[in-house]
Amino acid sequence: MKKIELGHHSEAAKPDCIKALIVEFITTFLFVFAGVGSAMATDSLVGNTLVGLFAVAVAHAFVVAVMISAGHISGGHLNPAVTLGLLLGGHISVFRAFLYWIDQLLASSAACFLLSYLTGGMGTPVHTLASGVSYTQGIIWEIILTFSLLFTVYATIVDPKKGSLDGFGPLLTGFVVGANILAGGAFSGASMNPARSFGPALVSGNWTDHWVYWVGPLIGGGLAGFIYENVLIDRPHVPVADDEQPLLN
């Protein structure tokens, strides 16, 4: 079992941490910009249809795959739930995870404010539960979808025994994100990412059901990270050094 390291505030001044935070901000910004932008475009062009859902799923799949690959300096988390899953697996310190969460929320907010400006004040679509879907059902949806996302991250990127999958992790993770949006988009919205939900809610001022997209993804991501690392991976404990980069690759 890997030990969770608290870290130290001195990490924030280390060059590797600063670089990681810059890259994490850029990749999360671009991910949210493309993801929310695709949702705004499809809503304007085709409305709330199956074609629109498919287009949004494909856009998210591609941008997740590319941004994880491009974000090798930070690990390309893009998502507080991914960061939590890696934290509970012992791959990032508590302090650096906290910095990542702030980074991700700021990046998402900046992307959505810019989208609102560039589209002449169009509303940023928020994640809400579909009619007839209860809070409990929505949370379970998000737990399962985010669990599958983190399970894929561990199986294809983190696991040292990934073998022939080495190098394909970002692409396969993107596929899972797209598939999950197709599966759950019509019911819970398939957020899987508190930061992805936070930016649009902040810009639109619509916080309806917003807490669901923190509770569900954080539980699902945390469970997947803890279970995969401590049950499915067999290796001795190696403490996280202060200057260690929390990479996914």
UniProtKB/Swiss-Prot annotation:
Motif (NPA 1): 79-81
One Gene Ontology MF term: channel activity
Disulfide bond positions: none
Transmembrane annotation, as ranges: 21-41, 50-70, 106-126, 138-158, 167-187, 213-233
GO cellular component terms, A-Z: central vacuole; plant-type vacuole membrane
Cellular location(s): Vacuole membrane
Main location: membrane
Topological domains, Vacuolar: 42-49, 127-137, 188-212
Entry-linked Pfam families: MIP
InterPro entries: Aquaporin-like, Aquaporin_transptr, MIP, MIP_CS
Key words, A-Z: Acetylation, Membrane, Methylation, Repeat, Transmembrane, Transmembrane helix, Transport, Vacuole
Residue(s) carrying N-acetylmethionine: 1
Residues the record lists as N6,N6-dimethyllysine modifications: 3
Alphabetized PROSITE patterns for the sequence: MIP
Topological region Cytoplasmic: 1-20, 71-105, 159-166, 234-249
Short sequence motif named NPA 2, residue ranges: 193-195
UniProt note on tissues of expression: Expressed in roots.
Family: Belongs to the MIP/aquaporin (TC 1.A.8) family. TIP (TC 1.A.8.10) subfamily.
Domains as described in the record: Aquaporins contain two tandem repeats each containing three membrane-spanning domains and a pore-forming loop with the signature motif Asn-Pro-Ala (NPA).
NCBIfam families: MIP
UniProt name for this protein: Aquaporin TIP4-1
Provenance organism: Arabidopsis thaliana
